[in-house]
A protein has these predicted regions:
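Sequence-structural signature of mature extracellular/luminal beta-sheet repeat domains
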Residues: 1-271
Length: 271
């Protein structure tokens, strides 16, 4: 996520329970440790944070794999980070391992909850939910399940008018991006927005992160790199960094696209 106050990009190193900051002036530095596994939740895997976002007040909100929660960072620039858990249960059961998030204009958080942060995935003894869902949370209401029929919900984005939600399904047997109508009480009219199953047979990677550009073009990390898709799901082209790409985001002015590719943070000039 781009952080204007730091004039830099924050990104997660999931398996090492760390988050890093990169700025033009200072380069790379460790920003958070631990980033997502603080022994808050029962877990036999030590993954850290995954998806990151800023709320309307500039607070850092984290999808924490290890702690199985959506949390807020309460102290910037301190040696030991302190987190406030926003949501970690649904109907009295632990979430799986929140993966990615997006905010709507009212400040609600939509987030995905696949089992990647559990050592044995769907078969893990600590998994309490019998599905991998997409949820909506806000400070004004209880967490709400909006979609439960995807096998591996991952990256998530909203259309510019917030009437459509896009969710990546990172499943090697069903590598697609789904689109849903956004209603007050959940998602409806689920349909395949883009089918990547043929591409993923010849290109490395599955659909993962999604980012909506102000032009309405969706930047989707997936087979071969970062796919550019228009609002009708037409594949406009692919940015191919040569490595499996996990996530991407823009800087404040959308001059650059930043992407995390295996062991590399890269950027591509857009304008």
């Amino acid at each position: 996520v781009w952080v204007p106050e730091l004039n830099g990009i924050l990104f997660s190193d999931v398996p090492n329970n760390k988050a890093y900051l990169w700025t033009e002036k200072k380069g790379l530095s460790l920003f958070l440790y631990p980033s997502g596994m603080t022994n808050h939740a029962p877990n036999n895997k030590s993954d850290g944070s995954n998806g990151l976002g800023l709320d309307s007040d500039g607070n850092l909100i984290l999808c924490q794999h290890g702690d199985r929660s959506i949390s807020r960072l309460n102290n910037w620039f301190f040696e030991e980070p302190k987190y406030e858990v926003l949501v970690d249960h649904f109907n009295g059961k632990w979430l799986n391992s929140p993966n990615d998030l997006v905010f709507d204009k009212q400040g609600s958080i939509y987030f995905t909850d696949p089992p990647y942060g559990l050592r044995n995935g769907d078969e893990d003894d600590l998994k309490e939910l019998n599905f991998n869902g997409v949820f909506k949370w806000s400070a004004r209401e209880e967490v709400k399940l909006v979609e439960k029929n995807m096998s591996r919900p991952n990256g998530i984005a909203l259309s510019l008018d917030e009437k459509t939600a896009y969710v990546a399904n990172s499943d090697p047997t069903n590598d697609v991006i789904m689109a849903f109508d956004v209603l007050d009480d959940g998602f409806s009219n689920g349909r395949i927005f883009f089918d990547g199953n043929i591409l993923s047979q010849t290109r490395e990677g599955l659909f993962d992160g999604l980012k909506m550009h102000s032009s309405g073009i969706i930047f989707a990390t997936g087979p071969g790199g970062v796919l550019l898709l228009d609002s009708m799901g037409v594949h406009l082209g692919t940015i191919m960094p040569g490595k499996k790409t996990a996530n991407c985001t823009f800087d404040k002015d959308e001059r650059y696209l930043y992407l995390t590719s295996t062991d590399v943070l890269a950027r591509v000039k857009l304008n």
